[in-house]
């Protein structure tokens, strides 16, 4: 099991936890929209560090992005394995060809 699977399992376990005792539970209790908003904030912070070229801060923000992505998935009951299966499906395809094959609209 990977660290991402371990983290996803921990997040899933915190769904029913007391929001006063867990940051993850507190975030999940605010609903999927807030989880998505927080993911977006963290993604922007990672972008800023990437542009600045600060490797250490980018690594830290990257970890935040991954955590908040997993929280956002959990808030919508989407399993990490579903996302990984989609990546596996796309593996070996040209990104251009994959994008062109997506349904329009």
Curated annotation (Swiss-Prot):
GO terms for molecular function: ATP binding; phosphoribosyl-ATP diphosphatase activity. Its EC number is 3.6.1.31. Pathway: Amino-acid biosynthesis; L-histidine biosynthesis; L-histidine from 5-phospho-alpha-D-ribose 1-diphosphate: step 2/9. It catalyses: 1-(5-phospho-beta-D-ribosyl)-ATP + H2O = 1-(5-phospho-beta-D-ribosyl)-5'-AMP + diphosphate + H(+). Its main location: cytoplasm. Disulfide bonds: none annotated. CDD domains: NTP-PPase_HisIE_like. It holds the Pfam family PRA-PH. It is found in: Cytoplasm. InterPro entries: HisE, PRib-ATP_PPHydrolase-like. Keywords: Amino-acid biosynthesis, ATP-binding, Cytoplasm, Histidine biosynthesis, Hydrolase, Nucleotide-binding. One of its GO terms (biological process) is L-histidine biosynthetic process. One of its GO terms (cellular component) is cytoplasm. Belongs to the PRA-PH family. This is Phosphoribosyl-ATP pyrophosphatase. It comes from Ruegeria pomeroyi (strain ATCC 700808 / DSM 15171 / DSS-3). The lineage of its organism: Bacteria, Pseudomonadati, Pseudomonadota, Alphaproteobacteria, Rhodobacterales.
